[in-house]
Amino acid sequence: MPRRILLVIFDLDGTLTTVESLWTFLHNAFHTWDNGRVLEQKYRRGEITYKEWAETDARCWTGIPMNTLLKALNQIPYSNGAKEVFQTLRSKHVKTAIVSAGLSILADKAARELGADLAVSNELEIQDGILTGGIEVKVSVAEKAKIVKDISTRFAIPLQEIALVGDRANDLPIDDCLRIAFRPKDDAARSRANVIINDDNLSGVLPYLE
C-alpha cells in the first residue's frame, strides 16, 4: 500500500534551482572565487569544519551591498516544474519546507515565491544594507537529519509521512522517510534513494507524493 505523504522537504541548490552551489555562484558573481576555491578544497580535505568554511566564505563578501546580492540572486532560475509542484502540493494540503546548507536569503526568497511553509538555512549578517562578513550557521551538510526531525516535531507529522527531495545523499538522511533523488549528482545519492528522477522537470516527483 502506498504511503501517505503529508510533508515534503526539499533541498534548494540543484533541486529547486538549477544552480548546484549558491556559494560558488556568488563567488563567481562577486569575483571572489580564487579565495572560495581554496576554502572549498580545505573543507573537502577535512582541514576545516563546515561551520568554519561558511564563516570564512562569508567574510570574503564583507562590504558588498545588499542590492548587489539581490541582483545576483534574481539571475538564478527555478528548476522546471518547481512552481507546478508547490501549487499541486498546496492544493492537496501537503506541507512543504526548504532545508538548505546554502543561504537563507535565497531559501526565504524561494519559500515566498513558491509558497513553502518553512525555510531553514544559513543567515548572512546585514547591517545598513551592507554584508558585514558575518553569518549564522544553522544548517551544515551533516545536520540535515536533525533538522528534518525538528520539522517533523514542529508540524506533528511522523517521519514515515515525510518525503525528502534532493540531489545529494546528505539531502536524504533518514531511512523512515520517502527519499527521492532528483537529478542525483553521484552514486551515493542514488544508493540512498527509494525513487530516482533523472528528468530535468521537478514535476516528475508528483506521482510518488500522491
Short names for language-model regions:
Residues F25, G81, I105-K109, P173, ...:
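Phosphate- and divalent-cation-binding pockets in alpha/beta enzyme and binding domains
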Residues T96-A101, L159-D200:
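Acidic, Mg2+-coordinating phosphoryl-transfer loop and its flanking beta/alpha structural elements
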Residues M66-I98, G102-S104:
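Short, acidic loop-to-helix structural element flanking the phosphoryl-transfer center
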Residues K109-I162:
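Substrate-recognition "cap/lid" segment bordering the active-site pocket of phosphatases
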Residues S121-I126, P184-A189, N201-V205:
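Short, acidic/turn-prone active-site loops that include or flank metal/cofactor-
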Residues M1-T56:
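Active-site neighborhood of HAD-like aspartate-dependent phosphohydrolases
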Residues W53-L69, E125-L131:
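Short, basic/glycine-rich phosphate-binding loops at helix/coil junctions
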Residues R90, R112, R190:
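Anion (oxyanion) recognition and catalysis
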